Amino acid sequence: MAVKVNEYYSLIQNNYLFVEIARRVDEYQKENPDANLIKMGIGDVTRPLAKSVVEAFKRAVDELGDADTFRGYGPEQGYDFLIEDVIENDYKPLGVELKNSEVFISDGAKCDTGNFQELFSKDNIIAVTDPVYPVYVDSNVMAGRSGKMGEDGFYENIVYLPATSENDFVPSLPSEKVDIIYLCYPNNPTGTTLTKEQLKEWVDYAHENDALILFDAAYESFIKTPGIPHSIFEIEGAKDVAVEFRSYSKVAGFTGTRCAYCVVPEEVYVKDANGNKVQLNPLWNRRQSTKFNGVSYPVQRAAQAIYTPEGKKEIQENLDYYVKNAQVIRESLEKMGLKVYGGVDSPYIWFKTPNDIDSWSFFDILLKEAHVVSTPGAGFGPSGEGYLRLTAFNTYENTVEAMDRISKLEF
């Protein structure tokens, strides 16, 4: 066969991080079928969909079962009823004004952050914080922007911005000119946040260097500390240089239901090969119209329900449940004498392995000796080596049990 493969796929690490974790866990479970594993690795939720969400879902399905209210293909960008509620509830309280045409409903922030790079030329220089959510890097490797990976674990054409304990997990601005910057706050995996003053430095950099910020705000609903920005658009000038991604996965338990959105302000312009300004919003709209048929009507009605008074109350109860879990994890690990980060305005807890044990080795220790599944920090990039991530998304009972098991280990 003469068909040629996309050669850039050969540059990707063999297994996606969470696929490798699942492989190791499945292998161990088969060998030890009686082991009661507590999974605190992948960021999947355990609380069921809120009652108001389920009811809205059912009503929408019933509509599709009636000839008078049946709907076929929906708008690729999303139904106005959900877009308008997004603007009214998620942005207006922050003082951010948006148009319907600037909000795009999708089936996940992972899809959006992975797909958005398709709009840009292969020769753009991207920058990522390190450690980093793997999708940002892998999608650019697939597109041919990364170059080869060196022995140090870094791709040669990607600019890495270390976020470590030495800089309080606040990466420095790039020392060189970059074109596209991926930021995620509250951060995955470290669970840390930026102040408005710190985020403004990134917006200023983007203005000064004609750069674009791709801002992943999937975990903003966990922010409790006053003054921490929930959106990059709270920063003056950000609508000229940023795109924002959000998700209903964690805030409303939609990990299996699939619904999210991104905001592409009409003020954002990029340049073509001749240096002419090109508006970004229509490009994303064109991409979605070609490659995406939209989120189903029942799912969008279900998502809309979280903005009702009852829905907001139910969603907050679930968020509070996970926040309590995060507090249990953080306090328990600190009592063990471990260095712990995150878990305050985030569902993720990032902690230093004891005695400088490498990430995958400590992952195996927790798996085999405590029957707790974690995520090794090295899977998020070289600066993640020597750390592990735990999530607050299991049940409260399992969370307490997991901490008790870990506390009994001899490091």
UniProtKB/Swiss-Prot annotation:
Homodimer. InterPro entries: Aminotransferase_I/II_large, DapL/ALD1, PyrdxlP-dep_Trfase, PyrdxlP-dep_Trfase_major, PyrdxlP-dep_Trfase_small. Gene3D superfamilies: Aspartate Aminotransferase, domain 1 (3.90.1150.10), Type I PLP-dependent aspartate aminotransferase-like (Major domain) (3.40.640.10). PANTHER family: AMINOTRANSFERASE. Keywords: Aminotransferase, Pyridoxal phosphate, Transferase. Involved in the synthesis of meso-diaminopimelate (m-DAP or DL-DAP), required for both lysine and peptidoglycan biosynthesis. Catalyzes the direct conversion of tetrahydrodipicolinate to LL-diaminopimelate. It comes from the Archaea. Its cofactor is pyridoxal 5'-phosphate. Pathway: Amino-acid biosynthesis; L-lysine biosynthesis via DAP pathway; LL-2,6-diaminopimelate from (S)-tetrahydrodipicolinate (aminotransferase route): step 1/1. Substrate binds at residues 16, 43, 110, 133, 188, 293, 389. The modification N6-(pyridoxal phosphate)lysine is found at residue 250. It comes from Methanosphaera stadtmanae (strain ATCC 43021 / DSM 3091 / JCM 11832 / MCB-3). GO terms for molecular function: L,L-diaminopimelate aminotransferase activity; pyridoxal phosphate binding. This is LL-diaminopimelate aminotransferase.
